[in-house]
Swiss-Prot record:
GO molecular function: ferric iron binding
Protein family according to the UniProt entry: Belongs to the frataxin family.
Entry protein name: Iron-sulfur cluster assembly protein CyaY
Positions of disulphide bridges: none
Any one Gene Ontology BP term: iron-sulfur cluster assembly
UniProt cross-references to PROSITE patterns, sorted A to Z: FRATAXIN_1, FRATAXIN_2
Gene: cyaY
A GO term from the CC aspect: cytoplasm
Source organism superkingdom: Bacteria
Statement: the UniProt record of this protein carries the keyword Iron: yes
UniProt cross-references to Pfam families, sorted A to Z: Frataxin_Cyay
General function of this protein: Involved in iron-sulfur (Fe-S) cluster assembly. May act as a regulator of Fe-S biogenesis.
């Protein structure tokens, strides 16, 4: 398990990476980072929320498809419920919101 400061650094790097990937690829999303929350808004107003839950050292995604909690396991962020990969869930949510294929590369 990471220390709290390691978790915060890792999650901030991940949030920055997501924003950079969206900007570099020109996908139609606006990103806002405030506190522990990265809000990604599609052109039609659909939102995907990515936040960190520091006490449990989890990343959470909230999207139309549902809510997901991810814990770090061997260098990957995997869903606590079904072991789905963070990037798979995020890319599906972003693709559904934008109507085009979105693929955020792994950090």
């Amino acid at each position: 398990m990471m220390t709290e400061s390691e978790f915060i650094r890792a999650s901030e790097a991940l949030f920055e990476h997501i924003e950079d990937q969206i900007d570099e690829n020109g996908w139609d999303f606006d990103c806002r980072f405030a506190g522990n929350v990265l809000t990604i808004e599609a052109g039609d107003g659909t939102q995907i929320i990515v936040n960190r839950h520091t006490p449990n050292q989890e990343l959470w995604i909230a999207a139309k498809s549902g809510g997901y909690h991810f814990a770090e396991q061997n260098g990957k962020w995997l869903a606590t419920r079904d072991s789905r990969d963070f990037y798979d869930v995020l890319n599906e949510a972003l693709s559904a919101a934008s109507g085009e294929a979105v693929k955020i590369a792994e950090l």
